[in-house]
Structure formats: structure tokens, C-alpha cells
Amino acid sequence: MSRGIVIIGSGFAARQLVKNIRKQDATVALTLIAADSMDEYNKPDLSHVISQAQRADDLTRQSAGEFAEQFNLRLFPHTWITDIDADAHVVKSQDKQWQFDKLVLATGASAFVPPVAGRELMLTLNSQQEYRACETQLRDAQRVLIVGGGLIGSELAMDFCRAGKAVTLIDNAASILASLMPPEVSSRLQHRLTDMGVHLLLKSQLQGLEKTATGIRATLDRDRQVEVDAVIAATGLRPETALARRAGLTINRGVCVDSYLQTSHPDIYALGDCAEINGQVLPFLQPIQLSAMYLAKNLLGGNAPLKLPAMLVKIKTPELPLHLAGETQRCDLNWHIAAESEGMVARGINTEGQLCAFVVSEDRMKEAFALLKTLPA
């Protein structure tokens, strides 16, 4: 008797997989299990909730019940999976268990909170649930410290500034977006943030947080202090691998999978932010969409290896939006930057004269797709 496909998780990756499976098979048994409410929301919207005065509930697009009815699923929200018996093909919660033919881990990633004194005072904005827990504090806060100047930190800094709040952003790198691009490319956005009033503390390190009568005191290196009303950790994500580890699967940074999204167990797969595909963790929407499409075929008996083309990453900073693609983080590229009032085009060229990466901003973003076609796959 068929036990069907069980998916652990209910985020973007899980939903994309369900939709792709149902395009090909309307009847295969599908079960989704997740610790949250399983309501659908658009996670990138979290970068703009403050300036748009949105509450957590405003983000909901579709209830779990509507999703289950539309796609003929069994849903188990607010359910923590405690163990996976890979050999027996069983997943277990505290009081239930489910058998599976194929299991998909779509457990996502959790926000990394720096291990400093007072770390419990830091907020994270990695889910609708996390925003719901702190939305009143963030709405009322006038002074905000953002720890981390990467993609999410830069988006949040601009959003809070647009909402009229006093924003300080701290990062130990010498420039924002340091893991994505060199400083000569990110400087245009960095200057815009500064012009808007964001106080950038680069080459700086947070050492501790302490509650005071009037807010939160952040202690930095070089005997500096700043007092704020809220502190947000935007220091990256860590793939959720605990369940996979307990199941005996191979783990590195994420749950290791091959080009078929298959883990070290032949009937267990991983998808989305938790997955490490052939050594790469790709926590962006487009690779997740493509991965879900290929995995659906493979779960239903196909044999389709994932092929990822060069893809755009969008940085949603409305006052100066950016699109980037290729190996922008490579340190051996020679960057050719054309910056004008209407926008910037930065091309990363290797020693053989080939385009390997690009970053475009503002009105020059319309050139992104033509540039994308010239990148190596």
C-alpha cells in the first residue's frame, strides 16, 4: 500500500513543491507537517513591514485550510517532528507518527544570533511568526540597531529609516554587502543609506547588550556605546539540520543533496534553505523554484538532474534597488563600473576578458536580462 510523500515544512520551498507535484499528479497522497500555523505569506515582505505599517496578520495570503483544500493535502500545523526513523520510513512527533514512501525535508533556516552577552535582547525577522512576536516593540521603537550589513540588514536599515526611525547599522566588514560584492560596487548603496541618515558603524564589533531604564545599551569595541530601543540580528541564516542529523543523513553546512535533491538516504530528499546542493547553499527564490520543479518530477518516478542557469538576486532597497548575478563575490575579478545619475552598471571581468558577474542599479536594472544571457551557466 502506498504511503505517499511526506513533506516537513510549510514555507516557500514546500509550497512550490506541492504545486509542482499537483501539476503532474492529482491523487498521490501528500502530507505536510510543520511547527508553525502553515498560513502562506511572502517572506521577502518582511523587509518592508515597518515603512508600510503592516501588521503580521496583514502578510497572510492564504490560510492553511484553503491551501489544503486547493491542493488535496493532509496538513498538520503546530506539530514538531522529534525523530525520523529512516530505515523504517517513519517520522515521529511527541504523540503521532507518519509512514512515508518518500520524505522531503523543507525545514528552512534559522536566523543566526551572535553569541554576545545579552543576546536574548536581540530580535530576528526571519518569519511571520517572529515578526508577530515583536511587532509592537518594533513599531514603537524610535532608535534601532541592526547587527549585520548584508542583504537583509541593508534592506531593513533602509526600511526603518524610511519609517522615520533613527537607524544604526553595525558590521565588522569594511563595507556593506561584503559577502556579495566588493566595496567599489556596493559603495553607491552605502552612500545612499548614509545620505538617508543611517549611521553606519563599519569595521566595528558588537560586544554586548544590556537593558537600561531608557532602552538597550549596546557596547562596541574601542570603548564605544550606543543606546537604542530595539536591536535586530541580521547576521545570516543557518540551515536547519538537526532532524537530518538525527536521521543519520550526511550534513555539512546544510543537508547534503545531489543534483536530484536526494540525501544520503535514497528515499529522503531536501529542498530550500536547509539544503546544500552539491556543496552550495542557495537561499534565494529562483533556485528554490527550479529545485522544486525538478524534485517533483523525481518524486513521481522521473530522473531529472537539477540544472541551474545564471540567476538574478534582487536587493529590495527601494531608494536604490540592485540586481546582481554571477560570481560577484570573487576576489580575482576586475570591475568595470559605469555610474551615472540614473543608475550603475558594474561588470566583473576575469583575466581572460570574460564577463563573470554584474551588478546593476535603479534605471539600469532593465539591462539585467541582456547581461544575464552572456554569463556562463
Swiss-Prot record:
Its cofactor is FAD. Belongs to the FAD-dependent oxidoreductase family. Pathway: Nitrogen metabolism; nitric oxide reduction. HAMAP family: NorW. Gene3D superfamilies: 3.30.390.120, FAD/NAD(P)-binding domain. It is found in: Cytoplasm. Its EC number is 1.18.1.-. Pfam families: Pyr_redox_2 (PF07992), Rbx_binding (PF18113). Keywords: Cytoplasm, FAD, Flavoprotein, NAD, Oxidoreductase. One of its GO terms (molecular function) is oxidoreductase activity, acting on iron-sulfur proteins as donors, NAD or NADP as acceptor. Its main location: cytoplasm. One of its GO terms (cellular component) is cytoplasm. This is Nitric oxide reductase FlRd-NAD(+) reductase. One of at least two accessory proteins for anaerobic nitric oxide (NO) reductase. Reduces the rubredoxin moiety of NO reductase. The gene is norW. NCBIfam families: PRK04965.1 (NF003437). It catalyses: 2 reduced [nitric oxide reductase rubredoxin domain] + NAD(+) + H(+) = 2 oxidized [nitric oxide reductase rubredoxin domain] + NADH. It comes from the Bacteria. PANTHER family: NITRITE REDUCTASE [NAD(P)H] (PTHR43429:SF3), PYRIDINE NUCLEOTIDE-DISULFIDE OXIDOREDUCTASE DOMAIN-CONTAINING (PTHR43429).
